[in-house]
Curated annotation (Swiss-Prot):
Gene3D superfamilies: alpha/beta hydrolase. Pfam families: Abhydrolase_1. The gene is yqjL. It comes from Bacillus subtilis (strain 168). This is Uncharacterized protein YqjL.
Length: 253
């Protein structure tokens, strides 16, 4: 029997947050964190095919989708506090499996640094992680999206502060299974693409059990273009977390 979806609004520090949650038979809940200025609607096509053994928790960050505006600074540290408060309000207990896209990986990364014993694994989709603060190239597709959505979710200064917060507080994640998925469909020059890939490669050192997947037919929105790869990644991380010995993918396609 399929678990019922619960759609609720919780008020945290005066801001109303829209959430959706279902329970799973395994006790593990996948927590989805969307990219910059993007609502939780972005995950709907992917969630439709996730097995019922997994619980699912999604939400709209402040100022996005069906959530209200917040007077608090829109930094990753503040957003992690809000996520933790929402999980507590919704009575969604660990263990968690984190799946995040782009800037969402900054929030997930900081969350994992604070609560690595509650998170059994992470899947990062084209993450804005690593030494991103000193990154000289941002893919054109991401730059346009970032500029367009900036007014929805904070300022450039807050975005930069979030990257610095993570860099300052980054810790090694031990044996936490970690998969990084990089998009492969780029129009930029090779050197710039190589810099982006190197950024993602550097993230692998955060865990003793990490792997990399190149989604060769995907744009920045891998979960839209090749959702089957994301499904495989989630299941692979889950298996690795259960066994702490399962091999992780090195490449796809």
């Amino acid at each position: 029997m399929k678990s019922a979806w619960m759609e609720k609004t919780y008020t945290i520090d005066g801001c109303a947050f829209h959430t959706q949650h279902r329970k799973g038979s395994s006790g593990v809940t996948i927590v989805f964190e969307a990219g910059y200025g993007t609502s939780s609607e972005t995950w709907k096509p992917l969630m439709a095919d996730i097995d019922d053994e997994f619980g699912i928790f999604t939400y709209d960050r402040a100022g996005i989708g069906k959530s209200g505006q917040s007077r608090a600074k829109r930094t990753a540290d503040q957003q992690v506090k809000e996520l933790e408060s929402l999980l507590k309000a919704a009575d969604v207990k660990p263990p968690y499996l984190a799946v995040s896209h782009s800037y969402g990986a900054v929030i997930t990364g900081l969350w994992a640094c604070k609560n690595k014993h509650d998170i059994i694994g992470m899947v990062l989709l084209d993450p804005a992680l690593g030494d991103c603060a000193s990154f000289t190239f941002i893919p054109e597709e991401m730059h346009k999206s970032h500029t367009r959505k900036m007014m929805l979710e904070g300022t450039h200064a807050e975005f930069s502060k979030s990257l610095q917060e993570l860099k300052k507080r980054q810790v090694h994640l031990g044996n936490m299974p970690l998969l990084v998925l990089s998009s492969g469909e780029r129009t930029e020059k090779f050197a710039a693409e190589q810099e982006w890939q190197n950024l993602h490669s550097s993230i692998l050192s955060l865990s003793n059990q990490s792997g990399w997947i190149q989604a060769k037919n995907s744009s920045h929105n891998i979960h839209h273009d090749e959702p089957h790869i994301v499904h495989l990644a989630i299941y692979d991380v889950w298996c690795a977390a259960c066994q702490q010995a399962a091999p992780l993918y090195q490449a796809v396609n």
